[in-house]
Amino acid sequence: MLEIGSLVDGKYKILNKIGQGGMSVVYLAMNERANKQWAIKEVRKDGVQNFEVVKQGLIVETDLLKKLDHPNLPSIIDVIDGDGSFLIVMDYIEGRHLESVIREYGAQDQADVIEWAKQLCDVLSYLHSRKPPIIYRDMKPSNVMLRQMESHAY
């Protein structure tokens, strides 16, 4: 697990933990030279069975994602193959997961929901139009970010 305050790859300072999934932890990091925040997803060897197989899949996936260019998809900035972990540096999307918004506030305004659905359909259409098509198999409210002060779904 990355330490808060530690420096990764000589340039990314870990600020805090912002999320956790089944096999990964996501941190907010700062590239102090560029004065820019990034999200760093850490997949640890000790938290995954068949880590080498998972790592190879992540390498293929991140190589594919680096080539994507859509306003509602975070960009992959860097991949760091560390000793015992695999790190993916990506755009930090400031906002909340759709899941937490629904849990806290319940049903949402119809106009907002329609706008979010349009944006999600646009992203999925973009992914499906790639050659070969990209099929996103993990669509769920906890994987959709809603930006603050805007009605953009990521």
Annotated model-derived regions:
Residues 116-117:
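Activation segment signature within eukaryotic-like protein kinase domains
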